[in-house]
């Protein structure tokens, strides 16, 4: 039998630029995995940015820390066997940052870093340090760690755009 482990992240409640439907989409995907695929609820982890989960102390609050810790917890979870199916779904804001890189063959190369925006993006931590988005490079590193310890059956679904440019 196929074994699934699912991480669902849906963020509606951003300060200044809220979204609608991300939390309900994550809940609908949860329903699909439970009702249609038969995944036990204890194998589904939710991070939801809504009025019901508005406190950073809530373990379901989709802060940068909680989002980046959750995939790491998959890599170290002894119950997940090598080759099990892992699905990570994200619905929320995305971002895109341009940067310039010197290239020997070209004068200048324009590249982009794409990123996921946690609920606490555009805020600062307790030391006043700005909380960064989760870059594509960081996400790749996290997925590589999961792949190394749990196998290559990882599906990532990103329901976001990259309109917030910096």
Regions found by a protein language model. Name each.
Residues 3, 59-91, 95-166:
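Caspase-like (clan CD) cysteine peptidase catalytic core
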Residues 6-8, 46, 156-158:
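Structural beta-sheet core signal
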Residues 14-20, 52-60, 128-129:
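Second-shell loop/turn segments in exported
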Residues 28-43:
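Signal peptide-proximal N-terminal region
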Residues 14-27, 31, 132:
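Glycine- and acidic-residue-enriched helix-capping/strand-helix junction motifs
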Residues 1-17:
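Short glycine-rich His-centered loop
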Residues 10, 29, 88:
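Terminal peptide-recognition signature
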Residues 45-51:
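RNA-recognition motif
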